[in-house]
C-alpha cells in the first residue's frame, strides 16, 4: 500500500518534489525557449516526450522505475508550464518574460504562484486555494478521456513519457480539459449582452437564448452545468463554490460570483421547461474553477495546463494500476455499420460504378 501516513512523510514527499522540480541542463533553452507554442498544452506534451531522452532507463516499466518517473513528472510539469507561459508572453504578447529561480521550500501551489507573478508575491490563503484546486482536479476515475487514453497506451507496454503525453493531448480538447475555458467565454459573453449580472430575469433570458442556440457559441450548451457521472451534485463544485464565495466577498468579483450562482440555480428549471427534460442537472467543477483562477490572477492560457499539472498524479496512479493488474492490451471492439461491398479493381471503376460500401442508417441497424 502506497500512502502518506503522517506529517513527517508528507514533509519528506514535498521536499522530494522540490528537489525534482529542476529541469535537465539546457532544457529550458533548447526545448522551451527556442520553440514557443501558441498553446501551452502542446508544449507540455512535447517536453514530456523530450524528457525521455534525458532518462537513463526510459523504457523500464517496472513499478519502481515508473514510480520514479512519475514523481519526477509530477514535480517537473509545473516548471515546464510556468516557463512555457513566460515564453509565450514574450513571443506572442510582446510582454516581459520572468524566469524566477526555484525555491526548494515551496509547495507546488506556491511554486506556481511564485513563478507566474512578476513580483513573486502571494498570500497563504491564495496558495491554499490553488492547492485545493490542484487536489480536486488530480483524479476522477479511469473512464474520463485522458485517463483512459493513458491506460490504453500503458496496456501496450509503452514508456511512461509516451503514455503521459497521450493524456495531455486528450486533456487539451475543449470537450475535456478545455471546458472551464468554455465556461469563462460563456460568462464573458453574458456580461457583454446583459446590463445587470445579478438580475434573475436577464440571466434567465440569456440562458434561454443559449439553449435555443441564439447566444453564447450557438452550440446550445450551458457550459459548467451537467456531468456524465454526477446528477445530484458534483462535490468538487460544492467545495470550490464555498471557497469562491469567501474570496469574492467584498471584491470586484462578487457580482460575477452571484451571476454564476444564478446560472447554477436557474439552468435546471429553464432546461426542463424549454427542453421538456426532467433529468437532474447540477453544476460541475468547471462552473466555478474559472472564476477561482481569475481571482488568483491566473491567465486563461494556464487554465487547462493547470488541469494537466493536477491530473498528472491521477494519470500516474492509473498507469501503475494498469501495469500491476491489467495484463492484456486494451482493445475496444468496433462494429461496422455498413453492408459488405464487392471489391472493384481501380482499373474497372467508373463514375457510375465506384467502389463503395453501403451505409446503414441507425434506425435500420440490427
What are these regions (language model features)?
Residues 5-366:
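Non-transmembrane, aqueous-exposed alpha-helical and coiled segments at domain scale
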Amino acid at each position: 500500500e502506497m500512502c502518506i501516513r503522517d506529517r513527517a512523510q508528507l514533509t519528506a514527499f514535498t521536499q522530494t518534489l522540490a528537489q525534482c522540480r529542476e529541469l535537465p541542463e539546457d532544457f529550458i533553452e533548447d526545448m522551451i525557449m527556442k520553440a514557443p507554442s501558441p498553446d501551452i498544452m502542446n508544449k507540455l506534451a512535447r517536453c514530456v516526450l523530450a524528457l525521455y531522452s534525458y532518462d537513463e532507463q526510459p523504457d523500464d516499466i517496472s513499478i519502481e522505475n515508473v514510480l520514479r518517473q512519475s514523481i519526477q513528472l509530477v514535480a517537473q510539469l509545473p516548471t515546464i508550464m510556468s516557463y512555457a507561459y513566460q515564453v509565450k508572453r514574450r513571443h506572442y504578447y510582446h510582454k516581459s518574460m520572468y524566469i524566477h529561480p526555484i525555491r526548494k521550500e515551496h509547495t507546488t501551489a506556491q511554486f506556481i504562484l511564485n513563478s507566474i507573478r512578476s513580483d513573486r508575491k502571494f498570500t497563504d490563503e491564495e496558495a491554499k486555494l490553488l492547492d485545493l484546486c490542484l487536489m480536486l482536479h488530480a483524479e476522477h476515475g479511469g473512464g474520463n478521456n485522458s485517463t483512459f487514453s493513458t491506460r490504453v497506451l500503458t496496456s501496450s507496454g509503452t514508456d511512461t513519457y509516451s503514455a503521459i503525453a497521450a493524456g495531455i493531448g486528450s486533456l487539451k480538447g475543449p470537450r475535456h480539459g478545455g471546458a472551464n475555458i468554455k465556461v469563462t467565454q460563456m460568462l464573458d459573453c453574458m456580461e457583454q449582452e446583459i446590463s445587470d449580472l445579478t438580475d434573475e430575469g436577464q440571466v434567465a433570458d440569456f440562458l434561454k437564448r443559449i439553449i435555443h442556440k441564439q447566444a453564447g457559441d450557438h452550440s446550445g450548451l450551458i457550459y459548467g452545468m451537467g456531468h456524465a457521472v454526477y446528477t445530484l451534485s458534483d462535490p468538487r463544485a460544492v467545495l470550490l463554490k464555498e471557497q469562491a464565495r469567501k474570496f469574492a466577498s467584498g471584491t470586484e468579483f462578487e457580482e460575477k460570483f452571484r451571476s454564476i450562482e444564478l446560472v447554477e440555480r436557474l439552468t435546471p428549471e429553464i432546461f426542463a421547461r424549454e427542453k421538456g427534460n426532467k433529468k437532474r442537472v447540477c453544476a460541475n467543477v468547471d462552473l466555478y474553477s474559472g472564476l477561482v483562477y481569475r481571482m488568483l490572477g491566473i491567465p486563461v492560457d494556464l487554465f487547462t495546463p493547470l488541469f494537466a499539472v493536477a491530473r498528472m498524479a491521477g494519470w500516474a496512479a492509473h498507469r501503475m494500476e494498469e501495469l500491476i493488474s491489467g495484463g492484456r492490451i486494451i482493445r475496444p471492439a468496433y462494429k461496422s455499420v455498413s453492408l459488405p461491398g464487392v471489391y472493384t479493381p481501380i482499373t474497372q471503376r467508373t463514375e457510375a460504378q465506384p467502389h463503395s460500401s453501403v451505409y446503414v442508417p441507425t434506425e435500420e441497424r440490427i
